[in-house]
Amino acid sequence: PKIPRKDNPRSSFTEDEYKKLLKVARELADTGIKVRGIPLTMELYYFIVLVVHTFMRPTEGEIFNIKHQDIKELKNGESLEISCITGKTGTRVLNTTKDAVEMYDKLKKIHPDHKDSDYILFPQYKNRTTALKTVNRLFNYVLEEASLKINTQGKTLVPYSLRHYALRTRIRKSKGKINVFILAKNAGTSVSQLERFYINQMELSEDERKNLLIK
């Protein structure tokens, strides 16, 4: 007999947990503190917001691999168009929310002499494994200081939890009116994955589920 597959909810932030994470990240950046000799600056804050508002994976192949030359600022100022060349699901072009435009502008200001071929995040680390590990340490420090290592569901929060929070929030705030096919394509995932790990784990009304076109 076929054993039913049980899908566990992905580790994600609640709205309050995400706001607390941002608040503590800002406060720590203002203190000039160092974590194992590495300054914790507003660049970590920008990283957090960018993951949420680009729906990208916080991995070497995705957000840590993005260079300035991969980004096109759309004329309306409402979105960035990002070419993700080495993503988990292959090459894709994604569009961001307006908040990502603001964060990208701030990143350019803290790296005013950047070249098109430079990475947008922590470009001083040419080895992107080093960049990833460094950011993970800084992120974990913020989680500890904010008492957010474990979320309200008892799950461990990690950088990847930002992506899960982003997708859940986008679905929830749309009240079921978002086109899940476009969202899945933009996030480099599939509709079935959205259904299994996000929509089926969320409290949605029957009308919202119908709007999401989930069969």
Q: Can you describe what each PLM-predicted range is?
A:
Residues 12, 86-89, 185-212:
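Catalytic-site neighborhood detector that most strongly recognizes the C-terminal catalytic loop/helix
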Residues 109, 113-116, 124-127, 207-215:
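C-terminal secondary-structure termini that scaffold catalytic or DNA-interacting sites
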